[in-house]
């Protein structure tokens, strides 16, 4: 006997309504509706803190084929505001599976909808840009859903880094996962890194630990003085959700690290914060970049790398100072993907070198960070 699901509605702020069925918790959720083109990795996407206050549309038609497990998470909980998919498979099968996707969503109290035309929705978002939306589960009331969608204030001006961040520092030594072994432990660190948690993904911390780093994770609002009290060899600025401009506490701390010539590496929101710290400007993108197949050109050696991306804001390259050299650009739309300072050991990248999900083509940036720390120690 096939399972039966309650009705659900997706409403966009422009009045567009989609009808489907609920595969998660009852109730409603509001946020910015975005689309992600990754074929796999839905569990990592859901638990990525960068998706806070965003309702994620997965464009691949079949989502949930391999279920979920306790290992493939990027945070302690689901951070995405909601989930939108085309089809939920009746049967999920994988040797690592512990629960079905629907069971997981209900347990995490995530409102989710399936059974809608995600191709049509993606075209709307592509042409009109990311929109505020509402998923209403268990109730057939389109006008209520539209009104709720329009009540969401939008992400511009919203400081979410301090919302998703930890409140107390902690140590991290878990390394990357390997088949037959699981996760490893770094017990012979060569470097000490202070990692700012603006919404950090676990796999970033694992890749740092894999490269010989003892990692001290600190809250987003940690001052530069408090961070430097740990006597780190380098500072890492993590990914995270929301608008970078309100994060004045992080911008001020980053300025201090750069002035002191502390090796500093930023990813995603950390990249944007570094851009603001050196005097640049950021802007809200029309649709943002969300996917695991984004081509980026490394301007230093000319190679093309496939990257994982998840951001709705970007740094304006024209606003950067003379000592900031552009290192990477998107081959989709030409937007800035990375820059370095020519007179300081500081650099950053807009995408996600740690992937999870996605390719590890640009994981060499972590090696560059450890090389900068090694040079400073000498």
Swiss-Prot record:
Protein's pathway: Amino-acid biosynthesis; L-arginine biosynthesis; carbamoyl phosphate from bicarbonate: step 1/1; Pyrimidine metabolism; UMP biosynthesis via de novo pathway; (S)-dihydroorotate from bicarbonate: step 1/3
Keyword ATP-binding: yes
UniProt keyword annotations, A-Z: Amino-acid biosynthesis, Arginine biosynthesis, ATP-binding, Glutamine amidotransferase, Ligase, Nucleotide-binding, Pyrimidine biosynthesis
Catalytic activity field: hydrogencarbonate + L-glutamine + 2 ATP + H2O = carbamoyl phosphate + L-glutamate + 2 ADP + phosphate + 2 H(+)
InterPro entries (UniProt xref): Anth_synth/Amidotransfase, CarbamoylP_synth_ssu, CarbamoylP_synth_ssu_N, CarbP_synth_ssu_N_sf, Class_I_gatase-like, CPSase_GATase1, GATASE
Location of region: CPSase: 1-188
Disulfide bonds: none
EC code: 6.3.5.5
Primary role: Small subunit of the glutamine-dependent carbamoyl phosphate synthetase (CPSase). CPSase catalyzes the formation of carbamoyl phosphate from the ammonia moiety of glutamine, carbonate, and phosphate donated by ATP, constituting the first step of 2 biosynthetic pathways, one leading to arginine and/or urea and the other to pyrimidine nucleotides. The small subunit (glutamine amidotransferase) binds and cleaves glutamine to supply the large subunit with the substrate ammonia.
Name of the molecule in the record: Carbamoyl phosphate synthase small chain
